[in-house]
């Protein structure tokens, strides 16, 4: 037998037992007549002692080096009281080695486990990076999450059904990864961006509770929390309303937090998209940050200051204030840095006002814009934002979107910089009632979620007549500023689906070509259905306390969508390309 126990599982209950351990040398210390090693496996680390009492094992241990793969047979003994290590889970015991077997020696590692290695090094030698205890713990947590989800889904009557990986390209927002067909030369499969249409078809097939933990693929520009291939917890239901779907999914996430880290998330508040954007400048607000945006256009619309009065009198403009309690200590240099920061989001500047004495009216205000205000305007502003002595007010004034984006980002930055964001808290919520459509860069209407989301209380005729007023029957789950899941009630009326396609500029010929199978299926007694998808990678990232999504994926890609370890992507064999009838054009 190669193993009877895991290293990290040993404790006082094992004292006196003979055990067989298999793992790696984490650290070695030679104290003359004795040799100690820390031995590591996926469960943790235990100290092993080599004593002259077992001379063969002691002699063999002299040749051990870090990362040798070994087997130890020995007895679990109590550490002397003065040698107990309270920083180790196994710190009350050690193993007295009786036999040592070296499975395999190790070259000097290209990574130093005791130093900060570059991410490039870590990804190139990922199989070594995963030996680090913190990385092993993250993947164990990920496995625990998926195990919990499967149990929950099974207990709640959901069926785990697989959907195809080789499918048809459909416009879902990002670019598809294409797979050429050898049999059908010149044609391509697409790797799925999500199982969206297949899970809707399963509802039409009568499987009223479906789930799947599934790989999805998107060929898009990457950020720190994005990967070209990622994993979704995909869910769809029939005959449930949006609140009922949210209730089930909230129970799942509530239970997941309790099971994984012992945290009770409490009841999730529900907030409309409009309120989230108005108060926090984001559709995924981080409620750990106490700062809020307050609209003041009605107060400043008549001031002799174009920066304020123009957007205040423009239906598409916005003037908003963030009050920072005790922020008057912020220096002019810091204010200049914040002004530069909001410029990234298109803001032309950042007005500010320090409240040196709230009881002194305008006389108590230090601000370059004070000369444009009068006592009534200042009184209105101070009352609206509840200004106090020692505060600073930051003003954003521009088009609605620019002000909202810039001030929303400033709110987050102020929260971090000033230590206002309560990092020890968990703040979940649901965001609902998103706009059905938004304008893209060319000014055309695009679906804010996807084109299969149902509008709320709109007929097809009303939707076609006034699409920009429509509210989507959609919902996102947000935790600490991260969107961890999103879903909607789906369109189940063929006329409504065709109307949405037309609004999005997809004519009847394109509808038949791209979605003919869906439009046909909608004709045959389609049930009302709704669903949701969680990002497993992002959930794991939150539950393990890392800010890098690559830390919770065993073999991730870089931000350039490359695998440094296997050197993928690579050039294809010319013979394989010939069989596929593909010629490669040299990139310019």
UniProtKB/Swiss-Prot annotation:
ATP binds at residues 218-220, 227, 483, 535-538. It is an enzyme of class 6 (ligase). It catalyses: tRNA(Asp) + L-aspartate + ATP = L-aspartyl-tRNA(Asp) + AMP + diphosphate. Residues 196-199 are annotated as: Aspartate. One of its GO terms (biological process) is aspartyl-tRNA aminoacylation. It comes from the Bacteria. The keyword Ligase applies. Keywords: Aminoacyl-tRNA synthetase, ATP-binding, Cytoplasm, Ligase, Nucleotide-binding, Protein biosynthesis. L-aspartate binds at residues 172, 218, 449, 490. SUPFAM superfamilies: Class II aaRS and biotin synthetases, GAD domain-like, Nucleic acid-binding proteins. One of its GO terms (cellular component) is cytoplasm. It is found in: Cytoplasm. Homodimer. Catalyzes the attachment of L-aspartate to tRNA(Asp) in a two-step reaction: L-aspartate is first activated by ATP to form Asp-AMP and then transferred to the acceptor end of tRNA(Asp). This is Aspartate--tRNA ligase. The gene is aspS.
